[in-house]
Amino acid sequence: MQDLAFHLLAFLFVAAFIAGFIDSIAGGGGMITIPAMLIAGIPPLQTLGTNKLQGLFGSGSATLSYARRGHVNLKEQLPMALMSAAGAVLGALLATIVPGDVLKAILPFLLIAIALYFGLKPNMGDVDQHSRVTPFVFTLTLVPLIGFYDGVFGPGTGSFFMLGFVTLAGFGVLKATAHTKFLNFGSNVGAFGVFLFFGAVLWKVGLLMGLGQFLGAQVGSRYAMAKGAKIIKPLLVIVSIALAIRLLADPTHPLRIWLGH
């Protein structure tokens, strides 16, 4: 399976670079990499496992880039990242038990709601606002819950973390983006460990795409730090709506099946 033709490997590398760029700013890289791997003929389970491997490079690259500029303190936020990883482990392990159809059915509408929130809310910039919950409560509740979701299903995880950081933690948009990437790295580590245990990782493909992700995330995170909320907000809105449309357009989407289309 890993002996893919050169043009397919080149295609996956480019897809990973673009995904790394977009994901480092607004999340949603999986909506590029997962279809790309399926198009290349990689089976669904190996696609999910390999996606987590290459995603580690993108989220890790963006996290380091943001941390070097002081937008996230890795030591201080490590407990939060560990809770995200723990949630993702449970999510990946329980993926067969959780009603996946319900998640798939409601996710597009949640993403549209997030897009509307970020698109219509005025005065949302890079300045921190008053927090609605303590960091302790945020770490013990929302973080593992979103990490769990990432392990079970995945698409839109970055949008949910962004929403939590902005609305509950009171973070500015750029700071929220930086912290989102670190927690996304944590959930990627957790879910990747489970897929690795079950042997669902294609190393050659994952490492090649990981290089593309790393480079794309370096470019994307630098662009985000240069432009701040001016680029992060609109890209987050676009990515959320695009992901919602892609999910609804899928013939296997539960809503389309229930409606008989």
UniProtKB/Swiss-Prot annotation:
It comes from the Bacteria. It is a multi-pass membrane protein. The keyword RNA-binding does not apply. The keyword Transport applies. It holds the Pfam family TauE. The chain crosses the membrane at residues 8-28, 29-49, 78-98, 100-120, 133-151, 152-171, 189-209, 231-251. Its main location: membrane. Keywords: Cell membrane, Membrane, Transmembrane, Transmembrane helix, Transport. It is found in: Cell membrane. One of its GO terms (cellular component) is plasma membrane. Belongs to the 4-toluene sulfonate uptake permease (TSUP) (TC 2.A.102) family. This is Probable membrane transporter protein ORF9. It comes from Sinorhizobium sp. The lineage of its organism: Bacteria, Pseudomonadati, Pseudomonadota, Alphaproteobacteria, Hyphomicrobiales.
